[in-house]
Amino acid sequence: QNVDAFLFLTPTDVMFAAACRARVTQPRVIVTATHGQMTVREGLGLISTENKRRTALVGIDQWGAMAKVVALLGEYGHKSALYFAGPNEWRDAHTRLDAWRKLAASRSIDSQIVRCHTWDASEAYAHMNHLIDEYGRRGAALPTAVVAANDNQAVGTMRALHEHGLRIPQDISVVGFDDMSGVDNMYPPLTTVHPDFEGLGVAAMR
């Protein structure tokens, strides 16, 4: 009753589809990422023409943020990297992976994608341990950088690297995403992307 507008936070494809299908006549703001298994165009196609005029989509510039990550790697001369992708049903994970693939290729960075089913540090830790062992068995050098789709994953990879005696950043660089609380107090501090969540909130409330 007496609702002026609806604000939908839709980190996953299922949530995005539900927000688009919602039968509301009030203005709706959908906070989401640009890429996913359901495209923005497909989602908007679920909204009637009349209601579409009262619908706004807002989100963080994930591509711009990833471009800064790739530029930083290029600045330090990295030519190879492991990319820890988030769960594919999350639109942020899908968008960041798409951005990473295209932008890394544009900088001629050889990229190995490590697919994770969760955002958990423990899963990234297990994957990193496996990769270190696998590269060791082959007598191959690890890529010179790790890029993670969120900071939890980056923390997991850092633990595995430390336990195998690899120094950060002397032996391998690690970059996270989201600037989670506490990562600046790690040793060494985690290099991470700081999304403008405050700006996103302001944009959504406009």
What are the functions of these language-model segments?
Residues 11-65, 152, 178-190:
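Flexible loop/hinge segments that line or gate small-molecule binding clefts
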Residues 2-11, 30-32, 82-85, 114-115, ...:
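Periplasmic-binding protein-like
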Residues 36-83, 94, 98, 121-132, ...:
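Hydrophobic alpha-helical segments within soluble ligand-binding/sensing domains
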Residues 1-9, 98-101, 105:
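Amphipathic helical "hinge" segments at domain boundaries
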Residues 105-147:
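C-terminal regulatory
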Residues 2-3, 77-80, 110, 142, ...:
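Short loop/turn motifs at secondary-structure junctions
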Residues 55, 129, 133-206:
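Flexible loop/turn connectors
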Residues 15-21, 99, 156-160:
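A short acidic, amphipathic alpha-helical/loop segment
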